[in-house]
Amino acid sequence: MNWLLVVAGGMIGAPLRYLTDRAVQSRHDSVFPWGTFTVNVIGSVVLGLLTGAALAGAVGSDLRLLLGTGLCGALTTYSTFSYETLRLTETGARLHAAVNVGGSVAAGLVAAFAGVTLADALWA
């Protein structure tokens, strides 16, 4: 049964990633991978919120599997982040690559912290 929850969440997260990535990237005339950056930050805040809610006892394991492992796992993408960073480096956009690495890690951490903090304010 657990794997079905993960699959169901992934069936929502994967198309959301694709559609969000395309929508965001189409609005930026830049080599910087704004779409991937956006989905990773959104996923970090959602996972932070879910984790904070779980720590407060407001969410059960089924919802964590559905939204945390399934939805957030499919929404976020470390492999695309890595590939796009490599491509930036290979095409000479080394500054963009460095900003992508530093900015993605920093923004992801801030987003996760914000999600946990929001959950703490809502459920603690």
From Swiss-Prot:
Organism in which the protein naturally occurs: Streptomyces coelicolor (strain ATCC BAA-471 / A3(2) / M145)
Superkingdom of source: Bacteria
Keyword list, A-Z: Cell membrane, Ion channel, Ion transport, Membrane, Metal-binding, Sodium, Transmembrane, Transmembrane helix, Transport
Protein name: Fluoride-specific ion channel FluC 2
Chief localization: membrane
PANTHER family with a match to the protein in the record: FLUORIDE EXPORT PROTEIN 1-RELATED (PTHR28259:SF1)
UniProt GO cellular component terms: plasma membrane
Membrane topology: Multi-pass membrane protein
Lineage: Bacteria, Bacillati, Actinomycetota, Actinomycetes, Kitasatosporales
GO biological process, one term: fluoride transmembrane transport
Family: Belongs to the fluoride channel Fluc/FEX (TC 1.A.43) family.
Location relative to the cell: Cell membrane
Transmembrane annotation, as ranges: 39-59, 63-82, 98-118
Binding, Na(+): 73, 76
GO molecular function annotation: fluoride channel activity; fluoride transmembrane transporter activity; metal ion binding
Reactions catalysed according to its record: fluoride(in) = fluoride(out)
